Swiss-Prot record:
Required during biogenesis of c-type cytochromes (cytochrome c6 and cytochrome f) at the step of heme attachment. It comes from the Eukaryota. It is a multi-pass membrane protein. Belongs to the CcmF/CycK/Ccl1/NrfE/CcsA family. It comes from Zea mays. May interact with Ccs1. This is Cytochrome c biogenesis protein CcsA.
Amino acid sequence: MLFATLEHILTHISFSTISIVITIHLITLLVRELRGLRDSSEKGMIATFFSITGFLVSRWVSSGHFPLSNLYESLIFLSWTLYILHTIPKIQNSKNDLSTITTPSTILTQGFATSGLLTEMHQSTILVPALQSQWLMMHVSMMLLSYATLLCGSLLSAALLIIRFRKNFDFFSLKKNVFLKTFFFSEIEYLYAKRSALKNTSFPVFPNYYKYQLTERLDSWSYRVISLGFTLLTVGILCGAVWANEAWGSYWNWDPKETWAFITWTIFAIYLHSRKNPNWKGTNSALVASIGFLIIWICYFGINLLGIGLHSYGSFTLPSK
């Protein structure tokens, strides 16, 4: 009872905080000069992170197993992972290029997890026999870590495509473009500072210098993030294969979840392979990664929505009216 009450409190704190953060984030996108609000948004993210961490620890202690047994718990863990990705550049004291992707991703994931759609999953339940294994934490956590990382990398690639295919793109009037500020807020500040510095120089700068510089940074970050995510996905699939052999007597059953996990792995393997070809590097490889973004959501959320196959534990069903 104590843990259930604590989880309830932490869930409401995280949902309330995330609602405030969403409001602040939207305001800062519309009014660029309000830097103080950006700091408040970051503090709200920190408060949400500690609330999520407390929730995960509380449920782990109360249930006796790592909280990854249904869609609700996995979404909470996914938002926690996205915040970790958001924090890594800050710990390294480097420019946080990922913040424009990780911040809204964390907000949306946590907001959906704590919404009323998953109410029936809020209560911790006893694991079914197939899930009562030490592989639960290893396999599922690796898969969710890979999903979070690959989603961030795919969004960076999608951002690259948006910039390259947008005609008449004026980097000197970005303040008027709310959509671009959503994805490239920190990049815009960097480009404004760069432009101001170069105005005082005497050497010529070609017109698309700023656009080229931004796309190169996005391409580099996307490749690095997806490479990490692909490694985590590979480890997660291998762990799942070993677990499947213990639980069902076969390493691979072509279950819908397994099939889409293989498709996801193949898509990002193609992306990494295409990076070795100079003719495919950049726009073409970014297109492959953007397709991967949709594939990940089908693999992770779509299969749970259908509730079919051997991986249908804790699947999501729409509440009846």
